[in-house]
Each structure stands twice: as structure tokens, then as C-alpha cells.
Amino acid sequence: MFSNFFGSSKRNTIASSSSSSKKDKDNGKDESSKLKNSGSSTLPKPITNNESGNNFITSPSVSSPLISPLSSSPSPLLSSSSNSIQSTSHQQQQQHQGVITSLQMKPSCTSLTDDIEKKKQAKYDSSLEQTARKWVCDVLEIQLEDDKTFYELFKNGVLLCRLINKLRGGTIKRINESTISFKQLENIENYLKACKTLGLQSVNLFNSIDLHENKDISLVITNIVVLGKHASKIEGYNGIHLAGERKIIKITTTPVSPLFGGNHNNNNNNNNNNNTSNGDLSPVSITSASGGSSNYNSYSNNPLNKSSNGKKAKWRKSVKIPAVSSLNSDIRTKEAFKFSPELQKAAQDWIEEVTKEKFKLPSFSSSLKDGILLCRVINTIIPNTILYINNGNSSFKKMENIGNYLKGCLVVGLKKTDLFDTPDLFEEKNINFVISNIHVLGNHVNKMYSHLKLPLIKNIGNGGNGGNGGIGGGGGSDGSPLKMYSSIIHSKFGNGSSNTSSGNGGVIIPPEDMKDLKDWINHHLRAHHSLQIGSDMSNDLRNGVTLLTLLEELTLQKVGIFAREPVLPWHFMQNICLLLNFLRENSVHNVSDISPHDLFNGDIHSLCMITRLIRENFDTDHQMKSIPMDTRRQKVIEEIIATEQSYVKSLSTVYNLLIVPLLNSLDTNSPILSNDEISSIFGNWEHLLRSHINLLKEFKLKLNLPFNDLTIDDSNQNQNHNNIFGDSIFDSNITIGDVFLEKCEFLKDNYTNYINNYDNSYQRVKRLKKSNSNFEELVNTFEIFQDTHNGLDLYSYLIMPIQRIVRYILLLKEVIKYTPSTHPDYQMLQNAKENIKRVADHVNESKMAVENKRKILSIQDSIQNLQFNLMDKERTYIREGFLEIEDTFKKDSYFFLFSDLLLFVKYKPSEETGKEFKYKEVFYLDQVVDVSDILSDDEGEACVDGDDDGGEYEGGNGDATSGSADPEDQTLRRSCNSNNNNNSNSNKSNTVYSFEIETCEFSLVLLAESHTEKIEWMEDLRSCLQHQLIKEEDQLSSLSLSDNDDDNDADADVESSLNSISSPLLLLNNNNIINNNNNNNNNNNNNNNNNNNNNNCKNSNININSSIDNNSDNNNNDYDSKINSEENGDSSDEENKTSNRRSVSFKTHKRLESDETISDTESDDYELVCGRSKKSQPPPVPPRKITFSDTIKNIDNQ
């Protein structure tokens, strides 16, 4: 029983042997006879159909486990009809006494793993994967391997990171092209962070393990497709995306019946004709109406309301809505969307006619919010209804007037539903309710108090007085005040009707400064080409996108969430309300005079008014243009003095509240910190403070400003930073550049010492706060005190000196900007700026040197069994990474490159020592002859295919001064470019990225993980070799040139000849150089196609074996030259001259043209012997080349 329920294959119940012996051997008998001949325990095979239509056959209990359940022998029941099976089903159930084995029955429940796999398969979409693959290939310009799964291609995260950098360059600074899991996970995490930076929502992301552990690859595919669609919105990216062509969406809506228009029969007919069923919720297109009203015709002429073929357009259900905005913003947008200026104007005119008083203020709400006019309207209808009207300015009295008016409306006969709340008017919560109430009151008075013969409220539909027509053209017969909330925006959407009034022949005269405003907007939005304003400024600005983007550019902050691609009228009004609300909160000007409705309908005067408002409040450059040059210069000088005062105050705050108590505690029995610990945190803080007090004193004395003789103890006194000069007159001829030149010499040493100690101080504070409770209490007390003043903590004060030098440079640039070139201070300011810039460069270099030492020290501490001290010489850390040694097949080989050596270690973390690496070998770069590229077959084919269109390279014309003119260098660049080409992807999985480091004794072939990494390693190695060679040659040159004063002329000739080939000063053997150059050029021509960069040391431009017999060399060279000239007879002389050979990390691009450069008598004195004098050179030994992999096993065994 339990066996059948759980489907366990280990609990099979076998039927008795008696039942198994009764098996019928006659396959030709029918089903009924077969049932009779079978024993009571023998059952036929019933067929049950599952939901998917598959048949599951349950075998009888007599079946033996030796018999396969998938037997191919036909069953008699399979040929019987389904009706006979159903007729005997009841009988079969009664006769069933056997047990069905678990192998013969479908399990009633599945495992969780199987369910998860089924769900993953159900979610997987192969077409979506192909879309993602194709887009990645198109963007990265590569070809992904079809035989690899999506998981295998993207597991390491490298392609994803490259994809992000293609969409926005430099987003991911470092891509770990490694096989180590945590580095691959780091790539995926960087990709996910970059997706958020680019604007993807969290719902479109995935977890790192979904990709790295293949948990749910469908989420990764979906993410890439969503990113492909989002790519069209990324600024600066104009490449391929998946969003499709951007279409202009044509929208047509059916507005609510016009409130003040006739011709309602047409609208009703439209509704009857189009809404054929109650369930049809699709809106009616007004373009289907025939003989509609003029309002409808004007709306149907709107290009936004028709499709391109003239037929009615439908609602676009998938309209892209903006991101979620705040509830208050949506409420304001809704009220502005329902607002109608025509209704407001009609209400204002009616109140003015009834009270015979004009509105005192241009704003409707501001004129009514005191409640006086409203109370007078009630008293005009029913005299003495409101006995006392408050004329005071206090808020509660104004609100009392509004409350009395609402009570008066009830007395007149209005319902409570026709009223509004007091805050709706006084706080302008909902001005639409107020307008609605006034219209209802006017219609009610015209109907119930007609004997008073009060003025009639205007009918907006026909623009005249419509008797009892009132609201909606029907005298309010529908009885629904909610009709007042319906907006007439739909009937004007896209028409810009506000621009075509009949005030001047139907044409609006644009403001005089409209062109100036247009140019100003285009200047600030020059980076946003899609937002540039064209000829129709009204239509370009009415959606609010351009003005909101302009605000973000000027304020350098996010204005809010708005629709960047508005489509619906709601989007337009949402942007406009956000714009007005931002200006209301951040501007000193009143924006209540600007109506959202006017902006929506493109009123050019309102748009120009709000543009002027933005320019006057947020464009500081425009504000500065109206200020004289001397005044601007004075403001910048005031800022210099003010920031210096503030800086001195901050320095003295730390000194008096922290350093002094710590120093005083040294005299006690239990000091808080030791003297060394205080110095390690604050460094030379006291010297900085004293120097800047003196500098501030000089500034004030120079500017004839009052200055108290400050000391360190009182330098933190409050200073007035708002007006430095006070009532004194600023002298325009005053100079401050000389003060910087005289007093800023202290910056170099003081700030260098402090900045070098900053990282140490930052870490020391964190460590001491954890270990020293007294120090933690002192720092917490200091920070609590600062919270009440400026909110800065100790770390904020410690970083101030680092930022000060840069601040000086920026301030000096501003002073120079507003100082005329004829001013006596101009040149001194220029010199002061350059001096401080040099100080900043020196500080940066010193900082880099300190960081380099710390890096080398950390590397040394991470290597066990290191046999020498990395700090014993002055060396620079360059790079590090995994490199596989050829033929060792080990992935744990790790290399550190320094300026003078290459360190080989094994990645082997040790729990005992806590060190990550184990020392193996060191290679000194002064023993390296060449670093050459080794192209694999795939790389070589790609290079050959790419030669025709490889592009032009600098120096490709054979220029002697161009480093990239070398054929090998061009080959490297072509091979690098071909890595991104579709031609190099057929056998990418088998591509080996290797290069060779060659010495006189052996060659070391290293394998990188990618082509880019290989090129970077080679470039860094060659740069180190060149630096090493130049350093040795400079030392050798100084020694050689000082040996004999009589040979100065000859030395000069050699120097000039060597300078002509753009190489450092070397001691060269003339004959060997010429012969070797000829030999190398020929060899390069002969072996260039094979990319053979591993020539013997005797063939290099630097003659290592200079002591070999010259006669033998000359004979060999002549013979080689003869053979090569025969083989390369078609090569021109110019090609031979421009053929280059890579030597010890730099190129000699131009060989010597003749043997007459150095005379025969001088050739013995000028020989290159690997940077050493010829006398100290050991006897020459023919170079032997062995592969380093032959001896690497011995190193591993050490």
C-alpha cells in the first residue's frame, strides 16, 4: 500500500507463484475468454488516460521483475475498443486483489528537484535566448559559439561587463578575466550594479547564483533582453538596441460631453453607434462622427488624434507610464488636469458683477482667500445673512469669513455636496471645488432668485449669457456638480488654441526676447540633441520635458520623477505640475500667475515667462553677466578670504578640542594616547594651523582689513563670512597673487607629509576607537559637540587638508577669469596658480610613491618562503595576475611584475601562515632580451584576413620616430582588433593567447586568459625593459664619456648619429651594428609572415656577443644577406629600410645608412655589451635556447 503511494522502487510486492502459473499462452483468444481462463487474482491490463492524453498501462500482479515493463509484445487489450474497457472497469475493480508494482505505476508525487527543473524548462524560451545572443553579438561585434550553452558563455561575467561598457564607456573599471569563482562572481555583481546605474528596475535583475550556478538561466536571458530594450534610453549610446523603431503614437480619446456646448445629439449618436455592448469598454473615436460640432472638428483635426491613413486611431494600451511618483504629486496633477481657466474666468466675472468690485490681485485664489468678497456675494443675495465680515489680516479671521460664506450658501439653498472645505480655498488644496461651488451658486440664484435680476453666469459653450442654461448648457438639469470637474483639455489637446486668439487678427505676437530664450535653452541642452528647440517653441516646451531637463542641468540635482516621453495628456500635466511645484519651492518669485492650463495648451507668453523665471533663479552665469567685472573679482576675493577663515577655524577646532587634551594627558599617569599615536593620527596638524594663520593675516593686511592678532588658542573664534569688506571700499587695483607667491612655499613640505600619513591616520582612528575606550569617549564627545554646529565628524575634518590645495587652484582660476590681462595682478596670479599646481603634482607623486611602498610591502607579506627582500631596492609595482606556463597545465601560476623583475609564485593559501602565495622563481629584467608575441593558428588566420582593412596606424609610413610603425607592433594591434571580429570566432574555444619572454639562456612561454590581457602584459613588460635599459645606458654613458677628454668630439659624433635613429645614447660597435641591421632587416623580411619574433641574441640590434670573431660574423652576414636577397628579390629597398626588429623592449626604426657614421679607428671604443663595459664582459658563449617548461618541474619540486 505504502509502496504504491510513494512510488518506491525498493518495495515491490510479488504475486504468488500459483497466480503466475496461470498465464494464458494463447494470444489469439478474445478478451472475455482470457478473463475466464485467468485465475481469480489475474487481472487484465487496464488503460487509464491522463490529462495529456497519454496511456498508462498497469501490469498485473503476476508480472515478474525479470520481465521488462516496456515489452514490445502487443497486448490483446490494446486492440480492443475503449467501450469494452469501460464496460468491464467495474468488474476489474472488484476482481483486483493483486498488488501493482511501483515500476509499473506512475508515481503519485514527484521530487522537488524534478518540479523545479520542469518549471525552469517551462519558463525557458529558446527564441528569447536567440534574441539575447544576437543582440550581444551585434553590440560587442563578436560571434558567440553555437555549440556552447548560454550558461557556459556568460558564466564568468566577462561578456556582461563588456556589454555594459559598450552601452556606457567606463562604467565597470576592472573586468576580472579569470577562472576563479569569486572573481567571476565579482564580475556578475559589477554587472548587476551597473544595470541599476543605467536605470533598470530591481524586478528585471537576477541573483548572481542564477547565472554562476545555473540556478535559473531564464532570468538572465530576460535581463539581457530588457537591457537591450532599455539601451535606447541610455544617453550617449547610439548603437543597436531591442526597443524597435520609435514611433509617434497617435491617440484619440472621447472627451466628456462639453460643459457649455450644444450639439449633444451628435455625441450621443456616437456613443450609441460605437458602444454596441455593455461589455465593450473601448473608447469611442470622435473622428467617426459625421457633422459634429466645431469643437469636435477642431479636435479631430489634431494630428495626434488621427492615424497616418486617416482612419480612427485606437487607444494604445501599452503606453509607457512614468515611474511611480508621490501621492501628493498625483493629487496636484489630477486637480490641475481638471482645472479649466474658462470656468474660473466666468466665476470671477460673475462675482465682480454681483459685488461691483474688481479683484484686487491677479490671482483668483489670492483674491478670494480672505473670504470678504464671498461674504458680500451672500449678503447681496440675502441681505444681512452675514452680520460681521472680518477685515483683519490674521489667518483665523480669514478662515472665519470663509466658514461664514459656506453657512450662507446653505441658507441660500445649496446642498452640502455643493460646498467645499475651508482649506480648499485658504490653503489652495483644491481650487476646482471653489470654482464649482461658485458656478452652482450662480445657477441656483438665477433659477430660485430670478426676481433679484442678478447677472447671469456665462455659458462657456457659446460664450454668451444663456438664460437658465448655466452649467452644461442645460441649466444644471442633470443635477450633477461633478460635471464641473470634467476638463476641456481633451478638446484642445495638441491644438495650442491659446496661441491663436482673435486679439490681433488671430495671431499672437511673440515676446521680444523669445529668440534669446530659445538660444539660451539650446546652449544649455546642447548635449541633449533630441530636446533642442526648433521653430515651434510653443510645441517643444508644452510637454514640460525640456524645461525639467533644463532645471536638472542648471541645478545639478534631480527635479523629480517625470515622464521623459509623454504621450497621454496626463503625462503632459504631470510634468507641468512638477515644474511649477519645484519653482514654487525653490524660487523667490511667485508662480501663481502662471496657469498649468496655459502651459499645457502652449501659450507662448506663459512659456517665455516661466523660462525667464528659470534663467533668473538658477543660471548663475547669466546672473554674473549683469555684474561688472570688478564686482565679480571682488566676490571671488571675498570667497578666498572667507574660505581661508573657515579653514583656519576648522583646523583650530580639532587642535583645541582633540589634540590639546591628548597632549595634556601625556603629563598624567594614564595618558589617553602615546605621543607616537597622536602623531600617527594628526601628523603635522599644528604646523598646518600656524602656517594658515599667517597666510590669513597676510591676506587681511594686504586688503587693509581689520585683523585681530590671532593665536592658535583663539583662532576658532566666530568670523563674519557674509561681508568680508564691510563698509570699506574695495580697491580694484589691489593684488593678492604676490601673497600666494610669498607665503605658499610651506604647502609643499607640510602637505606632502600630511597626505602621506592620511591613510595611516584614518585606519589608526578606527582601530583605536575599538581598542581604547578613553579615546573613543573623547572622539564621541567631540562629534556630539560638532553635531550642534555643522554636523561634521572627525573623518570629515581629517580630509580637509587634502582638499585644500585643489580648492586654491579652483579659486585662483576664478580670480584670473575676472581679472583683466592688463591688471598688475594678472601675471602674478598666473604664476601663483602654476606654483600651487606644481605643489599638487609633487604631493600626488609623493602619495603614489608611498602607496607603491605599501603595496610592495603587502605583497611581500603575502608570499611565503620569499628568498629576498622586495624593499631592498627602489622598484615600482606594475601589475599582477594569473599566467599559465606552457606545457605545465597548471592554473595556479601567479606573476607579479615590478619595474626591474618578474616574480613567479604559486597561489597556495596557507591557514598556518595566513599567506596566499608560495615563492617559486624570480626573473630579473636586465637578463631579458626580448618579449615577443606568439600567434596561435586562429589568431594568425584572423591577422591575415584583417590585413586589408586593418586601418591606418600611427607611423605606418615608416617614420623613424613612430613606435607603432614596426610590422610586429602592427601585427599585435591587428591581432587585438581581430579578436573583436567575426572572422576569429570559429575555433575560439581552442585559441591560446601566448607570448614569449626570451633571455640568452632560455625562453619562457606564458599563456594569458584573454587576448587583451596578453597585450597588456606585453606592453607593460616592454615598458619596464625600456626603462631598465635606459637607466643602465645612462649610467654607462656617464662612465664612458668621462674616461677620455680627448675623445669628446668623437663622442659627440656618436651621440648625434644615435640621436638620429631615435634611440638612447649607447656604446655601439659600428661594423657589428651595420652588419646586424642588414642581417636583421633581411631576416625580418624573410620571417615576417611566420611572425617569428624569437631571433637569436646574435641577430638582435643590441650586439650581445660582441666578442665573436668579426670575420666570422661578416662572412655569415654576407652569406645570409646573399641568400635573403635572392629569396626576397621582389622586395623593394624601401621596404628593407623600414623593416623593423623588436629589440630589448624598444625599436630601432631606422638603420644606419652607411659605414661612414663611425670611423674604423673609433669602432673599437664604442661597442654595446649589454649595458656593461667590454673589459668586464665574460668570454662569449654561443647562446643556447631551451624552453622554461623543461625546468619548471624542478622548481615545483623545491
Curated annotation (Swiss-Prot):
Boundaries of every DH domain copy: 632-846
The record's section on Pfam families has: CH (PF00307), RhoGEF (PF00621)
List the GO terms this entry assigns under cellular component, sorted alphabetically: cell cortex; late endosome
- Report biased composition (Low complexity) as residue ranges: 8-20, 59-97, 263-275, 977-989, 1076-1118
Question: Which stretch is the leader sequence?
Answer: none
Region of interest (Disordered), residue spans = 1-104, 260-284, 940-989, 1076-1198
Which residue numbers delimit the Calponin-homology (CH) domain? 126-232, 341-449, 511-619
Matching entries from PANTHER family are given as:
DH DOMAIN-CONTAINING PROTEIN (PTHR12673:SF78), FACIOGENITAL DYSPLASIA PROTEIN (PTHR12673)
Subunit relationships: Binds to F-actin.
Q: What is this protein called?
A: Rac guanine nucleotide exchange factor B
Q: Which organism is it from?
A: Dictyostelium discoideum (Social amoeba)
